[in-house]
């Protein structure tokens, strides 16, 4: 996994996770994260993109005929925030952020607000 920090404002995003090379059984990945995020937004974005990495590795997120599929269903017909792989990533991001804050910082977080980091501007 390579993590790249760069400006993603033009992409209306705080982060992306992409495979490098072939989409068949991908094992090399790049995670791009918006430069200069607040620390909590950076952590949430990284966790969100790591959920996507897990989806690729487990094979629940795939590319078929140039279209992204989640659990064998094309996601292209869904609006961004209704895409099932994004719904899962946002839900997991919240859980993982809670665990991180409790275990690393000793700060319980009851209901962290999701950052809605990827392509949110386009979805709204």
Identify the residue ranges that each predicted region occupies.
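Active-site hotspot residues in diverse enzymes, especially metal/ion-binding acidic/histidine motifs
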Residues: 1-8, 16
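Short, solvent-exposed loop/turn segments at secondary-structure junctions
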Residues: 8-9, 37-38, 98
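Membrane-embedded and juxtamembrane structural elements of multi-pass membrane proteins
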Residues: 10-12, 23-24, 28-33, 53, ...
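Short pre-active-site segment immediately N-terminal to the catalytic Zn-binding motif
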Residues: 29-46
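Post-HEXXH active-site segment of zinc metalloproteases
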Residues: 40, 56-87
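Active-site recognition of the HExxH zinc-binding catalytic motif
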Residues: 44-57, 89
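Substrate-binding/catalytic groove segments of enzymes
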Residues: 54-67, 98-108
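Long, well-structured alpha-helical subdomains associated
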Residues: 79-83, 93-124
